[in-house]
Amino acid sequence: MTRDLRNINYGAPIPSENYVDQPYVVVTNDGNWLCVLTTGPGQESQENQHVVASISKDQGKTWSALIDIEKSTEPINSWVTAVVVPSGRAYAIYCYNQDGISSMHGGIMAFRYSDDNGLTWSERFQVPMRLTKKDRENIEGGKTQFWWCIDKPVLYNGSVYLGIPKIHNGWRLDDDEGWLIRGDHFVDAQHPDEITWHTLPDGDVGIFNPELGLIHEEQNVEVLSEGTLYMVNRTVSGHPEFATSKDNGHTWSKPAKMYYADGRPMKNPRACPRMWKASNGKFLFWFHNNSYPGWGNANNRNPVWVSGGIEKDGDILWGEPEILLYDPDPTVMGMSYPDFIEQNGHYWATETQKMVARSHKIDPTLLVGVWNQFDANRRVDNGVIFDAGPFSAGATFEIPQLPSLNGGGFTLEMWIEFSALWEDHPVLTTMGKRRKGFNITIAPNHTLKFEMTDGQVRRWFDILDGPNPAASLKSTRIWNWTTDEWALQCGKIHHLVWVVDGASKVSSFMVDGKLLDGATTRTQGWQWINYYFEDINDDDRIAKVGDRFPGKIYNLRLYNRYLRTSEVLSNYHAGLPK
């Protein structure tokens, strides 16, 4: 079986001492990868945490021994990020806790540079951060500035840009706002004294919107083609946030929820939302597609979803998301603090689970898909094993064998119309004498209930509503999940697609070109299936439309694989088969 590049276990490990965070990679002028990261012998924020580098000459397959940017005997130093200027000089920018205040988020913004592609590093320099209201009102009265940085600096018109949050309470992280650090003359500076640093926006108050709560952190910035600065960050509102600046960072729009191209808000827990611009001018957005409002648990950061962005009229149109990475074990720590790498037409992503970090080659067809969603309109035939219709109430027909869900998957696609949405009325079932298969029934609030079983009592993760993953485990013979409330209407022909991805163990629904995300009534629209799900085929493999089904299935297709979101969208745009 071909390796699934989305499975993080197939990634290439990045070295560390034990704890490892923010593995960010730049391509140096010699073609090698220079990875900077925060590491330490213990866990996060413990003694001897420091910033290091490592070099790969084979695109992440192997790495050099760790190179100290700061020694572990120095005051705690963290959250290193990197950028390379055209001359080849590499900069490492990080938080250095020189005053010894007991917080991993306290200290100066420091940087060093390397003129030999990361092998050796200069003395330490300081970025002067302007003292503002958030600093003066912090728990140290401004004597220490509390902040950190997850951003990857970007270069534009000779300057460097990176976003940060300033924090009121140090480690507690319960009151923060966004700021932009801009360094002018950065690209051509021969000596750090030639760089002019600005803390923006102008004035005493940073970038935040109290309507979305007190948490506005982990800012990261990209520059649109005409110079608009686009900043994204995490919140505890269940949504990522964005703001834009048209005047080089001096003023900013009121931060708002990020939204898809059709205006629906995107969802993300309190986890790093990362935006990245490729050399083709298109964007990727890393997020988790659920709206759990707090820190979350292992599940809230697994899987990772990615949305493709297309620039239009000084804004970004974000497409429907795909699963980029997953851990097949949903009980372990999820992935976060990513970076994206582009070299010679190929793409990679890095991530960390705090005790292990990896790099991952990205399937180029996945990126082509997310970047072309708005134009794709060809019907996808690869994997079709059944294509027929129309079917009305009481119809029966034989279907092919579906793949085992132990690594395999399937997709059910229907063009379907309801004359009524009467609760408990059967729509379609494949369950026979052995009670294996799937069953679709009309449920309350214009939803459909999907049930699936392989005949065994299985445990599966219910919707994620607590900090303990085990608390969400349910034992049941029949897995079930519903479409979002009110996504279906009477008298309309819907494009309804059920995707069962047995590799990632994720089941999802799409209706009329939209990936259902739980809307306003649930934290998510996708759902885990059991890790051990296998054969759901009954002996006779007969599908039956409900005897009292109030409607018509104009066309039904089965695929012997999971379809990507982008493929489903292409089918939707292609329209109902003639």
Give the predicted meaning of each segment.
Residues 1-21, 26-75, 84-146, 154-218, ...:
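Beta-rich carbohydrate-recognition and catalytic domains
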Residues 28, 83-85, 224, 278, ...:
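Short beta-strand micro-motifs enriched in acidic
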Residues 32, 89, 159, 228, ...:
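Structural motif
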Residues 78-81, 269-273, 336:
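Repeated scaffold domains used in trafficking and secretory/extracellular systems
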Residues 218-220, 230-231, 272-273, 293-294, ...:
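Generic recognition of flexible, low-complexity loop/linker segments
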Residues 377-578:
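Extracellular glycan-associated modules
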